[in-house]
């Protein structure tokens, strides 16, 4: 435990596993109180226990990000308890089925955009005021290289990440002269997650980096000053 983020309140979506869990754990290890969100309470409790065992502090908030009312209620709860939010990590996402663009299933496409884009806008809208109350509000959004570099069969997921990047960067431009809020796009690169295993079922997981490496890169970046619109690409 160190105290680099002592007094900071952080919220991480998709915090029950993978990059989200690793990032939440790393932030807590630096002294932040971390609000953990995901759909499954049991998995969140395991991350919370690990944080407590390491001497950190956390609060779990099980919710479905596609339920805008749940997000609004969480924002009210954070306002009442802490009155600010210093770090918001938008990590939760779904991959969907990799397929040619003409073969994309319309219903799945709608679900994918609901989580990967619409829910992210609702998160930004719901926590904007709390981020502005921080003396150094930071909003991070996890993306993928396919958001900026089109790749065959990745059209649905790539389009959702391109939309997310644009949304976050527009928000950053809107608030940069009105507050201390700064936005960051994080491209984690090849990382050992359940989503990557689904996308690359034949890949040897030992050949790609652990989520903790991405989390450490995020923490180190948050210790520095940077302009809004910063892009962090985690190599390896």
Predicted feature residues:
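Amphipathic alpha-helical dimer-interface segment in Rossmann-like NAD(P)H-dependent oxidoreductases
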Residues: 76, 115-135, 172-173
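C-terminal helical subdomain
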Residues: 181, 185-186, 193, 201-236
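Catalytic Tyr-X3-Lys loop
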Residues: 102-121, 140, 164
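Catalytic loop of short-chain dehydrogenase/reductase
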Residues: 94, 132, 136-163, 168-177, ...
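Conserved mid-core segment of classical short-chain dehydrogenase/reductases
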Residues: 72, 95-110, 153
């Amino acid at each position: 435990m160190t105290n680099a983020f002592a007094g900071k309140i952080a919220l991480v979506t998709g915090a029950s596993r993978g990059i989200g869990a690793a990032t939440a754990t790393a932030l807590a290890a630096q002294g932040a109180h971390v609000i953990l969100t995901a759909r499954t309470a049991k998995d969140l409790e395991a991350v919370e226990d690990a944080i407590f065992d390491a001497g950190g502090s956390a609060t779990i908030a099980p919710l479905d990000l596609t339920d805008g009312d749940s997000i609004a209620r969480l924002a009210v709860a954070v306002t009442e308890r802490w009155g600010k939010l210093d770090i918001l990590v938008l990590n939760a996402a779904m991959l969907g089925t990799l397929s040619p663009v003409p073969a994309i299933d319309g219903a799945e496409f709608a679900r994918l955009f609901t989580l990967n884009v619409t829910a992210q806008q609702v998160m930004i809208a719901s926590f904007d005021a709390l981020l502005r109350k921080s003396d150094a509000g930071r909003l991070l959004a996890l993306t993928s290289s396919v958001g900026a570099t089109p790749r065959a069969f990745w059209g649905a997921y790539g389009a959702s990440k391109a939309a997310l990047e644009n949304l976050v960067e527009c928000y950053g431009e809107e608030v940069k002269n009105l507050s201390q809020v700064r936005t960051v796009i994080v491209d984690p690169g090849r990382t050992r997650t359940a989503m990557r295993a689904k996308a690359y079922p034949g890949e040897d997981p030992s050949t790609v980096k652990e989520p903790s490496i991405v989390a450490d890169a995020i923490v180190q970046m948050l210790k520095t000053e940077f302009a809004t619109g910063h892009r962090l690409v985690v190599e390896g």
